[in-house]
Amino acid sequence: MMVENPQILVVEDVESNFLYLNAVLSKINANIFWAKNGKEAVDIFRNQKNIDLILMDLQMPEMNGYEATRIIKLENPLVPIIAQTAFAMSDDREKALEAGCDDYLAKPIKSKDLLNTVEKYLNGR
């Protein structure tokens, strides 16, 4: 059974991409937190103790998604982190998984793929 009103941290530096993800995730009544870079993501994760899932952009200013993922996974190995990036090369996927991401979505992300992936991890918790 899926978490009701899941708390999802969306880490995305491009506002139009965030607004799209936010619109799609509103279909599952998610409470969305927005971080514009990896540093903000780590800060929000530390302050919001009940994050159910993180959608992590990999290429961002200040602190990239790989580094933010490593820090968050050290603090809570159980929180699912789904990488999202326009760099859909296989080595990016491997780098994301090595950093601790649980899954990977290539941009542009189809709403169906996003919801299926998010629901898979929320159901597994």
Task: Give the location of each predicted region.
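Helix N-cap/capping motif at the beta->alpha junctions
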Residues: 13-16, 34-43, 65
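Two-component/phosphorelay signaling modules centered on CheY-like receiver
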Residues: 15-33
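Active-site beta3 strand of CheY-like receiver
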Residues: 49-55
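Receiver (REC) domain active-site loop signature in two-component systems and cognate sites
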Residues: 60
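C-terminal output helix
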Residues: 109-118
